[in-house]
Amino acid sequence: MVKIIECPRDAWQGLSQFVPTEQKKLYLDQLLKVGFDTIDFGSFVSPKAIPQMKDSAEVLNGLDLDNSPSKLLAIVANKRGAEDAAAFEEIDVLGFPFSISEEFQQRNTGSSIDQSFGRVEEIQNICEKTGKTLLIYISMAFGNPYGEAWDPEIAVNWSQRLHAELGIEVFALSDTIGVSDKKPMFLPCRDYLVVVDWKTYQNQCS
């Protein structure tokens, strides 16, 4: 089965001009009619980091969710953001950007990969208590522009550890820099498909 995550959040956060809250709501209401499996609509992170998404809580108010099969996903980067997002009944999925690039993880979340592993544990605990699903975006899954070691096995190995130690079951392989090629990822992922729910996500920021 093919499941599509639509991600207006990723496009919005790259815009310098603020998109009005009501305009975001109108657009999301149209997307909710399409039937996507999940819509990554917003983020609960510091507004200093991503000013465009400072209204994510307001955007939820008044969305027409009754007649849509789509689940709503919000990005979080730490325990506080997870607690804020999990308080909303409308949100089904919390997403955490877990990069296999040390450089990008520091830039994106202000934490090392090892520190981020600890954050994932905290967020997973919150999800389990509140009935949410935690999706891990494996950032830089298809390449690394910083000259660091990269191999498909690195993405798979981190995913295996997140699954085995923390019980994470849903992963999105994220093409952060737009260089995806399914061939190098196929063999490492093939034997692991029976264990976790893999999604592929062509994305420029997560």
Task: Locate predicted features.
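N-terminal capping/small domains of soluble enzymes
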Residues: 1-80
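Glycine-rich, proline-tolerant flexible connector loops at the mouths of alpha/beta enzymes
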Residues: 37-62, 98-111, 140-146, 172-183
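Glycine-rich anion/phosphate-binding loops
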Residues: 17-25, 73-83, 108-123, 149-157
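Hydrophobic faces of well-ordered beta-strands that scaffold small-molecule active sites
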Residues: 2-10, 37-41, 70-76, 92-96, ...
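Distinct, well-ordered alpha-helical segments
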Residues: 52-53, 57, 83-88, 146-155, ...
